[in-house]
Each structure stands twice: as structure tokens, then as C-alpha cells.
Curated annotation (Swiss-Prot):
NCBIfam families: 16S rRNA (cytosine(1402)-N(4))-methyltransferase RsmH. The keyword Endoplasmic reticulum does not apply. This is Ribosomal RNA small subunit methyltransferase H 2. The gene is rsmH2. The keyword ATP-binding does not apply.
Length: 314
């Protein structure tokens, strides 16, 4: 199956990266290389693009798609959390732009055996972005305590029926192991009142999101590495991040704001004495959203938000 990933907010991201032909750029979530292709074709022979992804299918597809650019492009199978080490191994200390597209790819959603989608009834409960990891969604569903299931569905899925869903999962697995998306869907459906199911979208959506985030440590990786990525930027360099739900967006918004104004002095102080220096400027006071045209062409873009931060000239 061809690796597909509609490049959400592609033109807006490319425009905000301010690409210089001889610059060095990093795509930390390479996917199908839709964004990376647009970056690479704007580079001269002196420019470089480093693409990072933990998904083996993405690495293969991106390698084929970007082959025409030759040595201009380097692809590395890793998590963007290891960006600094990846760049160091390539002899690169600073870059001119970084982008992250935090969405699950269309390929991942549309390949049932990957277990990301609740729309398939007989897929295995997998959800690993990196299949080298041992833990799967099946392990979480069948081994986490009721309290831990409740916690992740509440915190990562923001589902008001989290407690009941966790209770139903634990009750069901005591009879037999839960192994497929279809089995999990039926359990979740039974835990949500019928009148809510009729109007609230697919009942499994929030629980699947919660399990996926927990399994792949998505929020921890984002939260723990934003500061380091900003530090990797040259003066005037930009980081562009596309998020797909409020949990991610809040982390990015808060981090960019903190790096723009890190002062911890009380408001009553006439001058700053804490010594914390601004690293740059938030370019997007409000996030950039998909155009009407994009929303018509790709319904999966509807929750996307792009935020941009520019490193200070030191």
C-alpha cells in the first residue's frame, strides 16, 4: 500500500519557515515527506534537509519520494526527541528551521494492521508509531489497572465518560482478552449513553487518542524537547509546529510564550532581576488554521493548528 499523508497546512508551513536556499532544515516528523519535498526543492546544492521519523513505512516511502534530491537530503530513523544527537552525528550543531507535523499519518490510519483506527472492526490493537517498541495498545488495554485506564482516558482523551469506559474495559477483559479494535469499540460503545452516541461523533475516538498518546509518550516527548529544539536554531531561524488537538496545542502555545518572555520576577518589580533572557519571538499570536479550500479537500485537517516561533538575533 502506498504511504499517504496529506500535508496539512503545507503552504503555510513552507512560507513561515522562511527557507534560504543554502540553509539547513529539519523535518522531525517526516511521514510521507509532503512538507519535506517542498523544503528540498527550494534548497540549492549547499542546502541540507534532515528528515527524522520513527516509522519504518514512512522512512521507506520518504526515501523514494526524496531520492531526486540526492545528497541534499539525509533521512534518519529515530524519534525527534533525539534530534540533537542525530544532528551532532552528522556534524551539525545549528539549523535554520525545524518543523513538526504531529498528526497521525493517513497511511497509519488507513492501514488496519497498524491498529490506529476505530473504523476497522477486526484490526489488532497495536498503535505503535515505532514497531521496534515491545509495548502495544493491546498490552495497555489488558494490563493497565482500572485507575490507570481512567487516568489516561480522562487526561489524554478528555472523555467525560472515562471512568465508565475504564470500568467496562476491566470487566470485559476478565472474561477474555481484548485483542481487536472491534472488540474494544463494542466495550466503549456500551459505556457511553445512547443519546450521547447519537450526537457526539464516534464513541471510540477519544479513547483511541488517549491510548495512542500513552503508548507513544507523545505529550511527554513534545513537552520535554521544545526548549532543546529552539536552542538548535540559528539566530533568525524558525520552528513551525502543527498540532491536532488541544493537549498538544496548549503545550506548544505555553512553551513559545515562556521562551519569548521567561521573566519570573513579580509584576511589581520595576526591572527584571531574574536574569532569564528571551530566546525569540512568537510569530503566531493566534494559530494559523487551514483554509476553506483545504478543509473541503481534506477533512482530516479540520483540527489542525500551526504555531511559529523565531529565534532571536543574539
Amino acid at each position: 500500500m502506498e504511504f499517504k499523508h496529506y500535508s496539512v497546512l503545507r503552504d503555510e508551513t513552507i512560507e513561515n519557515l522562511n527557507i534560504r536556499p543554502d540553509g539547513i532544515y529539519v523535518d522531525g516528523t517526516l511521514g510521507g515527506a509532503g512538507h519535506s519535498y517542498e523544503i528540498a526543492k527550494r534548497l540549492s546544492d549547499k542546502g541540507r534537509l534532515i528528515g527524522i521519523d520513527q516509522d519504518a513505512d514512512a522512512i521507506k516511502a520518504a526515501g523514494e519520494r526524496l531520492a531526486e534530491f540526492g545528497d541534499r537530503v539525509t533521512i534518519v530513523r529515530s524519534n525527534y526527541s533525539d534530534m540533537k544527537n542525530v544532528l551532532h552525528s552528522l556534524g551539525i550543531e545549528k539549523v535554520d528551521g525545524i518543523m513538526l507535523d504531529l498528526g497521525v499519518s493517513s497511511f497509519q490510519l488507513d492501514t488496519p494492521k497498524r491498529g490506529f483506527t476505530y473504523r476497522s472492526e477486526d484490526a489488532p490493537l497495536d498503535m505503535r508509531m515505532d514497531d521496534r517498541n515491545a509495548l502495544t495498545a493491546r498490552d495497555i488495554v489488558n494490563t493497565y489497572s482500572e485507575n490507570d485506564l481512567y487516568r489516561i482516558i480522562r487526561d489524554y482523551g478528555e472523555d467525560k465518560f472515562a471512568k465508565n469506559i475504564a470500568k467496562h474495559i476491566v470487566a470485559a477483559r476478565q472474561k477474555q482478552e481484548i485483542t481487536t479494535t472491534g472488540e474494544l469499540n463494542e466495550i466503549i460503545k456500551a459505556a457511553i449513553p445512547q443519546k450521547v452516541r447519537a450526537t457526539g461523533g464516534h464513541p471510540s475516538k477519544r479513547t483511541y487518542q488517549a491510548i495512542r498518546i500513552e503508548l507513544n509518550h507523545e505529550l511527554d516527548v513534545l513537552r520535554d524537547n521544545l526548549d532543546d529544539m529552539i536552542d538548535l536554531l540559528n539566530p533568525g531561524g524558525r520552528i513551525c509546529i502543527i498540532t491536532f488537538h488541544s493537549l498538544e496545542d496548549r503545550i506548544v502555545k505555553s512553551n513559545f510564550k515562556k521562551n519569548e518572555n521567561p521573566c519570573t520576577c513579580p509584576p511589581s518589580f520595576p526591572v527584571c532581576v531574574c536574569g532569564n533572557k528571551s530566546k525569540g519571538t512568537v510569530i503566531t499570536r493566534k494559530p494559523i488554521l487551514p483554509s476553506e479550500k483545504e478543509l473541503e479537500e481534506n477533512s482530516r485537517s479540520k483540527s489542525a493548528k500551526l504555531r511559529v516561533f523565531e529565534k532571536n538575533d543574539l
